[in-house]
Amino acid sequence: MQISPIAPELIRLENIYVHRDERDILKNIDFSLHQNEIVTLIGPNGAGKSTLIKILLGIIFPNKGKVIAKKKLKMAYVPQKFNPSHSLPLRVCDLLDLEKCSATLREEIIQDTGISKLQTAKVQQLSGGERQRVLLARALLRQPDILVLDEPMQGLDIQSEAELYEYVRSLPERYGCAILMVSHDLQWVMQGTQRVVCLNKHICCSGLPESVQQHPEYLAIFGGQRVPYQHHHDHCAHGDHVEQCNHIDHPHIHPEPEA
């Protein structure tokens, strides 16, 4: 078995503690994310997943511990919910214009995410799936080192979910970004990620999906839910056989059918 070299580290958390109202939100968190890695964060409600993401994004600071990041680290975040005020009309093209990049990259990402026909639509009027694809496109236009996705499959139908799954797995190779995903979709977690981190205020277990599923703390939280693990990767996010469209030769997302 050939052992792949360890990719450069992008960010590391050391001995992180967060206290709020005399309660431990996070305790003794050691976590790192490497270039081109796909990591999924799972855990029950109240486990501290949102707090951990906020620390990584620099939105909040821990009460104790260190955050060590690569110089000029660029991060992009796709939130679980995005509800702009109806009093502030915002078209999709206006939202994308907030990110500066080449016209070629912009067109590529617009095509890949299936939002080319949504450019003049108001963000407030999009369906949940359309809005999710627009937010993903905007995040990719930022050309991040780390892309953070919070429940990206929510609001998608089965076909769109499968397409997004394949597309997300292609991103590290295509754009050179690491992916950190928060997800309750154990089917995706166990088949579409390289490393699973199970959080319940502390890191209960971490590693390959197959190993995590057998860990006692995972079993205690998820009640023995098991998903057949398929080894889709050679410690990178590519190499799968997927059915492609004739006009685009890489994973992408189809537009939603018109009503």
UniProtKB/Swiss-Prot annotation:
<feature type="domain" description="ABC transporter">
    <location>
        <begin position="11"/>
        <end position="225"/>
    </location>
</feature>
<dbReference type="InterPro" id="IPR003439">
    <property type="entry name" value="ABC_transporter-like_ATP-bd"/>
</dbReference>
<keyword id="KW-0406">Ion transport</keyword>
<feature type="binding site">
    <location>
        <begin position="43"/>
        <end position="50"/>
    </location>
    <ligand>
        <name>ATP</name>
    </ligand>
</feature>
<keyword id="KW-0864">Zinc transport</keyword>
<dbReference type="InterPro" id="IPR017871">
    <property type="entry name" value="ABC_transporter-like_CS"/>
</dbReference>
<dbReference type="GO" id="GO:0016887">
    <property type="term" value="F:ATP hydrolysis activity"/>
</dbReference>
<dbReference type="InterPro" id="IPR003593">
    <property type="entry name" value="AAA+_ATPase"/>
</dbReference>
<dbReference type="InterPro" id="IPR027417">
    <property type="entry name" value="P-loop_NTPase"/>
</dbReference>
<dbReference type="GO" id="GO:0015633">
    <property type="term" value="F:ABC-type zinc transporter activity"/>
</dbReference>
<keyword id="KW-0472">Membrane</keyword>
<keyword id="KW-0547">Nucleotide-binding</keyword>
<dbReference type="InterPro" id="IPR050153">
    <property type="entry name" value="Metal_Ion_Import_ABC"/>
</dbReference>
<keyword id="KW-0067">ATP-binding</keyword>
<keyword id="KW-1278">Translocase</keyword>
<keyword id="KW-1003">Cell membrane</keyword>
<comment type="similarity">
    <text>Belongs to the ABC transporter superfamily. Zinc importer (TC 3.A.1.15.5) family.</text>
</comment>
<keyword id="KW-0997">Cell inner membrane</keyword>
<keyword id="KW-0862">Zinc</keyword>
<dbReference type="GO" id="GO:0005524">
    <property type="term" value="F:ATP binding"/>
</dbReference>
<keyword id="KW-0813">Transport</keyword>
<dbReference type="GO" id="GO:0005886">
    <property type="term" value="C:plasma membrane"/>
</dbReference>
<protein>
    <recommendedName>
        <fullName>Zinc import ATP-binding protein ZnuC</fullName>
        <ecNumber>7.2.2.20</ecNumber>
    </recommendedName>
</protein>
<comment type="subunit">
    <text>The complex is composed of two ATP-binding proteins (ZnuC), two transmembrane proteins (ZnuB) and a solute-binding protein (ZnuA).</text>
</comment>
<comment type="function">
    <text>Part of the ABC transporter complex ZnuABC involved in zinc import. Responsible for energy coupling to the transport system.</text>
</comment>
<dbReference type="Pfam" id="PF00005">
    <property type="entry name" value="ABC_tran"/>
</dbReference>
<dbReference type="GO" id="GO:0010043">
    <property type="term" value="P:response to zinc ion"/>
</dbReference>
